[in-house]
């Protein structure tokens, strides 16, 4: 039963990450698995679960604060292309995404669909 709860938790973390960020599901899954594993290990060793939860929440706040301090605005078409290329692992896809974003603007919507036809 505990394994199923853990699996459902990790699945929910991946889904939420995909819904909110659209990327980072692997990282979120690895972090969730580590938190569950270490949390259970600490509880088994006698740690108070509520104290662990509070500690995790404080750590999340600190990590969020640190990430936000180091975050940089992506504003130019070149920055968008570079960021998208890293995410896609392909510079040509990064360039296509930057071009699409340039055309639709900040409030526009871009829909990407998988195709079985090469080049279309």
Curated annotation (Swiss-Prot):
<dbReference type="GO" id="GO:0140662">
    <property type="term" value="F:ATP-dependent protein folding chaperone"/>
</dbReference>
<keyword id="KW-0067">ATP-binding</keyword>
<dbReference type="InterPro" id="IPR002423">
    <property type="entry name" value="Cpn60/GroEL/TCP-1"/>
</dbReference>
<keyword id="KW-0547">Nucleotide-binding</keyword>
<dbReference type="GO" id="GO:0042026">
    <property type="term" value="P:protein refolding"/>
</dbReference>
<feature type="binding site">
    <location>
        <begin position="23"/>
        <end position="27"/>
    </location>
    <ligand>
        <name>ATP</name>
    </ligand>
</feature>
<comment type="similarity">
    <text>Belongs to the chaperonin (HSP60) family.</text>
</comment>
<dbReference type="InterPro" id="IPR027413">
    <property type="entry name" value="GROEL-like_equatorial_sf"/>
</dbReference>
<dbReference type="GO" id="GO:0005737">
    <property type="term" value="C:cytoplasm"/>
</dbReference>
<keyword id="KW-0143">Chaperone</keyword>
<keyword id="KW-0963">Cytoplasm</keyword>
<keyword id="KW-0413">Isomerase</keyword>
<keyword id="KW-0346">Stress response</keyword>
<dbReference type="GO" id="GO:0016853">
    <property type="term" value="F:isomerase activity"/>
</dbReference>
<dbReference type="InterPro" id="IPR001844">
    <property type="entry name" value="Cpn60/GroEL"/>
</dbReference>
<comment type="subunit">
    <text>Forms a cylinder of 14 subunits composed of two heptameric rings stacked back-to-back. Interacts with the co-chaperonin GroES.</text>
</comment>
<protein>
    <recommendedName>
        <fullName>Chaperonin GroEL</fullName>
        <ecNumber>5.6.1.7</ecNumber>
    </recommendedName>
</protein>
<dbReference type="Pfam" id="PF00118">
    <property type="entry name" value="Cpn60_TCP1"/>
</dbReference>
<comment type="function">
    <text>Together with its co-chaperonin GroES, plays an essential role in assisting protein folding. The GroEL-GroES system forms a nano-cage that allows encapsulation of the non-native substrate proteins and provides a physical environment optimized to promote and accelerate protein folding.</text>
</comment>
<dbReference type="GO" id="GO:0005524">
    <property type="term" value="F:ATP binding"/>
</dbReference>
<dbReference type="InterPro" id="IPR027410">
    <property type="entry name" value="TCP-1-like_intermed_sf"/>
</dbReference>
């Amino acid at each position: 039963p505990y394994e199923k709860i853990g699996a459902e938790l990790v699945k929910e973390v991946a889904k939420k990450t995909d819904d909110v960020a659209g990327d980072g599901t692997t990282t979120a899954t690895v972090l969730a698995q580590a938190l569950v594993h270490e949390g259970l290990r600490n509880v088994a060793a006698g740690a108070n679960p509520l104290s662990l939860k509070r500690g995790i929440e404080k750590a999340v706040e600190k990590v969020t604060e640190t990430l936000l301090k180091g975050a940089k605005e992506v504003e130019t078409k070149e920055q968008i292309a570079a960021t998208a290329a890293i995410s896609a692992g392909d510079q040509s896809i990064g360039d296509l995404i930057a071009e699409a974003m340039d055309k639709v603007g900040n409030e526009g919507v871009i829909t990407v669909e998988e195709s079985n036809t090469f080049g279309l």
